[in-house]
């Protein structure tokens, strides 16, 4: 008999759709938007991730722009902790600290407010998908600049073949995902 975690994993996998050649040829994009049509499934996802993070006692949850916000705010609320929005450059209204990181072609920049993380703050980092790990690694560098402590990474999906964990392990080895491909 399947466990509740296995049933949740099967339900998530059967709901996510693959979009071939998006955003560019050769890519198979994992589209999580169909999950948002099912409030009970969303609630189960939030509860499962919350259950993973609660024993670690994070002080804050840093959520990555933009799909990390979809479940991240609810997870932070369930944990009773602040959500720290990590945004693309120019999207936050207050003073920011930034980190530039490499893409396959070029670079990108993410930011957070300068007052988002206090020294010693225990931060979990959440996003929808762990692929190459570039954005999560840049977020780790932002948290470290603010003298925060990274205690966990939380993802809905991990694309194992891209080995994103390898980039994140130097910052924290607690790397959790609900489903793996």
From Swiss-Prot:
Keywords (alphabetical) are: Cytoplasm, Glycosyltransferase, Purine salvage, Transferase
Localization annotation: Cytoplasm
- Top-level lineage group: Bacteria
One of the Pfam families matching this protein, by short name: Pribosyltran
Q: Does the keyword Glycoprotein apply?
A: no
The biological pathway it contributes to is: Purine metabolism; AMP biosynthesis via salvage pathway; AMP from adenine: step 1/1
* Gene Ontology MF: a single term: AMP binding
Q: Which GO BP terms, alphabetically?
A: adenine salvage; AMP salvage; purine ribonucleoside salvage
EC assignment: the record states 2.4.2.7
Q: Listed GO cellular component terms?
A: cytoplasm
| Catalytic activities | AMP + diphosphate = 5-phospho-alpha-D-ribose 1-diphosphate + adenine
Q: Which SUPFAM superfamilies match?
A: PRTase-like
Which InterPro entries does UniProt cross-reference here? Answer: Ade_phspho_trans, PRibTrfase_dom, PRTase-like, UPRTase/APRTase
Similarity section? Belongs to the purine/pyrimidine phosphoribosyltransferase family.
Q: What does this protein do?
A: Catalyzes a salvage reaction resulting in the formation of AMP, that is energically less costly than de novo synthesis.
Instruction: Supply the PANTHER family for this chain.
Output: ADENINE PHOSPHORIBOSYLTRANSFERASE
Which proteins does it associate with, and in what oligomeric form? Homodimer.
Q: What is this protein called?
A: Adenine phosphoribosyltransferase
Q: Which organism is it from?
A: Cytophaga hutchinsonii (strain ATCC 33406 / DSM 1761 / CIP 103989 / NBRC 15051 / NCIMB 9469 / D465)
Taxonomic lineage of the native organism: Bacteria, Pseudomonadati, Bacteroidota, Cytophagia, Cytophagales
User: Which gene is the coding source of this polypeptide chain?
Assistant: apt
């Amino acid at each position: 008999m399947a466990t509740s975690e296995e049933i949740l994993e099967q339900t998530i996998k059967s709901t996510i759709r693959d979009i071939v050649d998006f955003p560019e040829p050769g890519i198979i994009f994992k589209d999580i938007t169909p999950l948002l049509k099912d409030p009970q499934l969303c609630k189960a996802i939030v509860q499962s991730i919350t259950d993973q993070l609660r024993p670690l006692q994070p002080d804050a949850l840093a959520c990555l722009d933009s799909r990390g916000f979809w479940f991240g705010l609810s997870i932070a609320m369930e944990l009773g902790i602040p959500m720290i929005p990590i945004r693309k450059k120019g999207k936050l209204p207050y003073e920011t600290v930034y980190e530039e990181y490499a893409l396959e072609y070029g670079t990108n920049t993410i930011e957070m407010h300068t007052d988002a993380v206090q020294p010693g703050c225990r931060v979990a980092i959440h996003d929808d998908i762990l692929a190459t790990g570039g954005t999560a690694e840049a977020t780790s560098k932002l948290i470290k600049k603010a003298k925060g402590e990274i205690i966990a990474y939380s993802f809905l999906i991990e694309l194992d073949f891209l080995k994103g964990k390898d980039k994140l392990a130097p910052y924290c080895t607690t790397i959790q995902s609900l489903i793996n491909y």
